[in-house]
């Protein structure tokens, strides 16, 4: 257990930061799920994708996730969106 005053304060501040980070990480997951759900239904929802990209970028800037983690997730979302768009285009052309 913490013995010094500064160590006790660090524990309190770490708890606040952990809650804030947890909340933001949850928001990131929610935005990604919304975008993926739309893609799974065959809809390229630009607004949902834009919101997911924005949330991922903000989380990376704030240090909640690593920038490469954000880039990888954005890339995978973009790949799925492209796949759905091409499938829809091929379906309408046929």
From Swiss-Prot:
UniProt entry tagged with the keyword Ribosomal protein: yes
Region of interest called Disordered, as start-end residue ranges on this chain: 1-20
GO molecular function: small ribosomal subunit rRNA binding; structural constituent of ribosome
Keyword field: Ribonucleoprotein, Ribosomal protein, RNA-binding, rRNA-binding
InterPro entries named in the record: Ribosomal_bS20, Ribosomal_bS20_sf
Keyword Ligase: no
GO BP, one annotated term: translation
Disulfide pattern: none
One term under GO cellular component: cytosol
Pfam families hit by this protein: Ribosomal_S20p
Stretches that traverse the bilayer: none
NCBIfam families per UniProt: S20
Family: Belongs to the bacterial ribosomal protein bS20 family.
Protein role: Binds directly to 16S ribosomal RNA.
Name used for this protein in its record: Small ribosomal subunit protein bS20
Gene: rpsT
């Amino acid at each position: 257990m913490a013995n010094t005053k500064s160590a006790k304060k660090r524990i309190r501040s770490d708890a606040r930061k952990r809650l804030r980070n947890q909340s933001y990480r949850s928001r990131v997951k929610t935005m990604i799920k919304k975008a993926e759900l739309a893609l799974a239904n065959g809809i390229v929802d630009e607004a949902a994708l834009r919101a997911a990209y924005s949330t991922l970028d903000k989380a990376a800037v704030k240090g909640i996730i690593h920038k490469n983690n954000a880039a990888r997730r954005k890339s995978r979302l973009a790949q799925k969106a492209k796949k759905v768009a091409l499938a829809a285009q091929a379906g309408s052309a046929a």
